[in-house]
C-alpha cells in the first residue's frame, strides 16, 4: 500500500495510476522477458489469477496492490510472493519499451471509462473544490500527459514516493506470524529510506458559507441524479482509537439507518417522489481531509425538483424533530443483532475481511480491536445511549453552511433543470419548510392478537397415488401429510 496520488504535479497527472500498471510489466525478480517470467504469467502458473487474485487499484490518496489465494502449504510460492511485494516496493524496471506499450493500454482504458457520468464528475471537481489540489485529481489523469511524459518523469516519481515510510504490508493467512515477519525483514533489508525525503502533504478542503452548486448534463447519462453534501471536519487520527470515537460512530450509524428507513418508506409509496434515495456519511467525495453527511436521489427525467425537495425535507424533519423512540428501538436491535451474528461467526471470518480492516487501519487509522472487544463494547454502550443523543447529532449533520450540490442528468432538447439560483434558494428555505413530526406507523403488536383455538379433523382420506393422507379440519383448512 502506498499513499500518494494527490501528490502529482500538473505535468505528472496520471503517473500514479500509470505506475500501478507498470508494476505488472517487469521487475527485478520477475522481468517478463527472455530471462524470466513476469509477475502475471508466473502467478497464473501457481493458480493465482490476474484480475481475481492478483490486482491493484489507484485512488486519489493511495495505491493498493493485492495478491490472494496464495497456496500457503507451498513455501517456495509464499517466498516468491514476498519477492513480488519487494519488487513493487522498490524494484519495478520501468523499461522504455514497456512504458510506451502501456501508454496504449491506458489510452484504451481512458476511452472505455470516458462515460458521460465520469465527464460530469471530472468537470464538477473545480466547483466542489475551488482553489484546491483536489480540483483536478482524477486518478486516470491527463491523456496528454499519458501520451507525452518523458521516461525519466515516471522513474523520478517512483523514486520520490515509493519509499518505506509511506508503505505498509498486510499478510493474512494460515501462517506463522513471527516467521513471516522475520522473512519480510530479510527480504526487504535492501530497501533503504531516502535521505531528506519529500514531505507527504495532506491537502485541506476549505469551508464555504454559500452553497457550491454544479449542474452537469451529458447525452450519455440516462436519468438525473442529485448529490447534496453537508461538509464536516474530519475526525483527527489521534482521536480514533478511543471509546468516544466508537460511541460517535454508533450514534452516527443509528441516525443514517433511521433516515434511510424513512426514505425507503417514501420510495415504496404509490407515487414515490424519487426512484431511489439514501443518506450516508464518509469522506467528502474524493478528499480524506474533509468528511460529509450526504443525501442522494435518483429521479425520473421530469422529477428532479420533487426529488431534491423531498430529500431536503426529510433531512430537515429529522434535524428539527429528531427520531422516535420506536424507530430507535428497531434500529438499535438490528445493529446489535448484526454484531451478535458477526461475533458468533467470528471463527468463519475470511482472510479478506481481516485484510480490509488492516488496510483501513494503515491508511485511515481506523481502530482494529477485534470483534470480541467490539461486541462487548456494543453490549455495554448501546443500551445506555438514548435516542436524544442521536437527535442531537442529527442537528449537527444538517448545517446551514458547507453545503455542496452536484446535479447530473441527461442532455435533451427541451429538458429543464432547476437553476443554481433556484437550488440555492431551496437550501435557504430548509429551516422554514412547513413540516410535521414523523409518525412511526410500524406496529409492534403481534400479527394475531387472540389465542388460536385448535380445530378438529372432520375428514380423512388416503391418496393411493402419492401415498399421502389428506385431512380436512373444522376451520376448513386442508392438510396433506
Language model region names:
Residues 103, 117, 154-185, 401-403:
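Non-catalytic, conformational "gating/processing" segments within enzyme and secreted inhibitor domains
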Residues 3-68, 119, 136-142, 257-291:
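M16/MPP (pitrilysin/insulinase) zinc-metallopeptidase core fold and M16-derived inactive scaffolds
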Amino acid at each position: 500500500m502506498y499513499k500518494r496520488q494527490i501528490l502529482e504535479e500538473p505535468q505528472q497527472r496520471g503517473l500514479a495510476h500509470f505506475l500501478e500498471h507498470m508494476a505488472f510489466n517487469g521487475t527485478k525478480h520477475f522481468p517478463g522477458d527472455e530471462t524470466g517470467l513476469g509477475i502475471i504469467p508466473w502467478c497464473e502458473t501457481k493458480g493465482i489469477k490476474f484480475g481475481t487474485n492478483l490486482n491493484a487499484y489507484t485512488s486519489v490518496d493511495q495505491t493498493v496492490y493485492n495478491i490472494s489465494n496464495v497456496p500457503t502449504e507451498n513455501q517456495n510460492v509464499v517466498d516468491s510472493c514476498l519477492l513480488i511485494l519487494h519488487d513493487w516496493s522498490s524494484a519495478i524496471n520501468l523499461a522504455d519499451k514497456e512504458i510506451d506499450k502501456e501508454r496504449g493500454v491506458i489510452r484504451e482504458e481512458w476511452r472505455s471509462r470516458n462515460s458521460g457520468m465520469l465527464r460530469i464528475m471530472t468537470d464538477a471537481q473545480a466547483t466542489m473544490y475551488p482553489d484546491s489540489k483536489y480540483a483536478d485529481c482524477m486518478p486516470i489523469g491527463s491523456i496528454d500527459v499519458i501520451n507525452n511524459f518523458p521516461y525519466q518523469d515516471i522513474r523520478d516519481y517512483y523514486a520520490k514516493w515509493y519509499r518505506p515510510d509511506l508503505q505498509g504490508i498486510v499478510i493474512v493467512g494460515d501462517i506463522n506470524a513471527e516467521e513471516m515477519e522475520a522473512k519480510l525483514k530479510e527480504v526487504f533489508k535492501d530497501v533503504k529510506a531516502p535521505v531528506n525525503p519529500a514531505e507527504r502533504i495532506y491537502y485541506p478542503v476549505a469551508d464555504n458559507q454559500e452553497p457550491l452548486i454544479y449542474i452537469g448534463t451529458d447525452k450519455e447519462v440516462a436519468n438525473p441524479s442529485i448529490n447534496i453534501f453537508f461538509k464536516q471536519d474530519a475526525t483527527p487520527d489521534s482521536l480514533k482509537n478511543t471509546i468516544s470515537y466508537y460511541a460517535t460512530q454508533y450514534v452516527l450509524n443509528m441516525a443514517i439507518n433511521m433516515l434511510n428507513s424513512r426514505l425507503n418508506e417514501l420510495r415504496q409509496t404509490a407515487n414515490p417522489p424519487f426512484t431511489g434515495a439514501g443518506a450516508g456519511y464518509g469522506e467528502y467525495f474524493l478528499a480524506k481531509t474533509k468528511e460529509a453527511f450526504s443525501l442522494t436521489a435518483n429521479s425520473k427525467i421530469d422529477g428532479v425538483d420533487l426529488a431534491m425537495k423531498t430529500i431536503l425535507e426529510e433531512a430537515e424533519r429529522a434535524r428539527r424533530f429528531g427520531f422516535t423512540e420506536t424507530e430507535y428501538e428497531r434500529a438499535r436491535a438490528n445493529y446489535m443483532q448484526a454484531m451478535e451474528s458477526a461475533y458468533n461467526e467470528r471463527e468463519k471470518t475470511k482472510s479478506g475481511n481481516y485484510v480490509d480492516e488492516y488496510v483501513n487501519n494503515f491508511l485511515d487509522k481506523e481502530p482494529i480491536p477485534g470483534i470480541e472487544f467490539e461486541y462487548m463494547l456494543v453490549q455495554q454502550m448501546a443500551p445506555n445511549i438514548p435516542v436524544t443523543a442521536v437527535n442531537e447529532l442529527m442537528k449537527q449533520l444538517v448545517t446551514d453552511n458547507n453545503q455542496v450540490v452536484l446535479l447530473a442528468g441527461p442532455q435533451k432538447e427541451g429538458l429543464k433543470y432547476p437553476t443554481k439560483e433556484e437550488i440555492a434558494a431551496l437550501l435557504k428555505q430548509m429551516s422554514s419548510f412547513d413540516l410535521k413530526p414523523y409518525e412511526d406507523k410500524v406496529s409492534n403488536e403481534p400479527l394475531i392478537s387472540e389465542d388460536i383455538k385448535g380445530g378438529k379433523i372432520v375428514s380423512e382420506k388416503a391418496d393411493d397415488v402419492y401415498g399421502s393422507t389428506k385431512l380436512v379440519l373444522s376451520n376448513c383448512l386442508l392438510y396433506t401429510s
